[in-house]
Amino acid sequence: MQEFLIPAKPDLQAARESWLKMLARERRLSPETVEAYERDTRQFLHFLTGHCGGSPGISDIANLRPADLRGFLAARRNAGAGARTLGRGLAGIRSLLRFLERRGLVNAAGAAALRAPRQPKSLPKPLTASDAKQVVSVEGQLAEEPWIAARNAAVLTLLYGSGLRISEALGLAGADLASETDTVLRVTGKGGKTRLVPVLPVALRAIAEYRRLCPYHLDPKGLLFRGARGGPLNPAIIQRDMAKLRSALNLPDTATPHALRHSFATHLLGRGGDLRTIQELLGHASLSTTQIYTGVDTARLLEIYESAHPRA
């Protein structure tokens, strides 16, 4: 239980709690990211307790030097944390310090000057086009209820057909894609940023079939995708069903819902999509994030989206 105690003085505890709420409500970070930042900063406060000789408060945070942060990263590295985990931890600490700085409580310049650990380059692991088609087809779904099979197919088709994150797909409203003529979708992604993505006819048909079979009233202002009891659809349900599909289709463990988004980008690039367009479709803030897909598939066949996508 000691791991979950927050070793900080009341002023810092309250400020940290306000920061975490801000990340979820205003920055609209995913619950998984907020949870990771909570865990990383909790570990940082545990480190400072030993480093400072007692529970730290805002005054202790204000007096932090880059050497203190380097000491924390070194301790985490010695405990077995990899570069990616260390980088995320530093990002969380920087975010907290910037939050405190905006309130006039600390100076975050020291943390900003600290270089993040070098991240290893790892290539995304997309599905093959044929495997992706099997995964998103309603015939391939394993759910016994027809409307749930149609729902799962519609969600997975949006991940592969439009490159959505699972949180973006499950955040769609009932009014979104209400007609098969709605070929463009406005998506709100990370950090509240919006982008326009094209929607393939196969995705529109999948959504229309889900609407037809869904036993619940889909209020235009409510969520489009519903759980078995009519509430919001939990991402874990899609991930669980994807795991069942993975087993049934004999796919690798890397075949996850997010791998469909990787497949979207990789297959477009391999069939002629340009990096700038794919960057915009994925909602990447930096082109360097998108450039990782150039190492996955270099075959170039067609030039435009409709003819590029295997589901077009």
UniProtKB/Swiss-Prot annotation:
One of its GO terms (biological process) is cell division. Residues 10-101 form the Core-binding (CB) domain. Gene3D superfamilies: 1.10.150.130, Intergrase catalytic core. InterPro entries: CB, DNA_brk_join_enz, Integrase-like_cat_sf, Integrase_catalytic, Integrase_recombinase_N, Integrase_SAM-like_N, Tyrosine_recombinase_XerC/XerD, Tyrosine_recombinase_XerCD. Disulfide bonds: none annotated. One of its GO terms (molecular function) is tyrosine-based site-specific recombinase activity. The active site is at 165, 190, 258, 261, 284, 293 (o-(3'-phospho-dna)-tyrosine intermediate). It is found in: Cytoplasm. Belongs to the 'phage' integrase family. XerC subfamily. HAMAP family: Recomb_XerC_XerD. Forms a cyclic heterotetrameric complex composed of two molecules of XerC and two molecules of XerD. This is Tyrosine recombinase XerC. It comes from Mesorhizobium japonicum (strain LMG 29417 / CECT 9101 / MAFF 303099). The lineage of its organism: Bacteria, Pseudomonadati, Pseudomonadota, Alphaproteobacteria, Hyphomicrobiales. The gene is xerC.
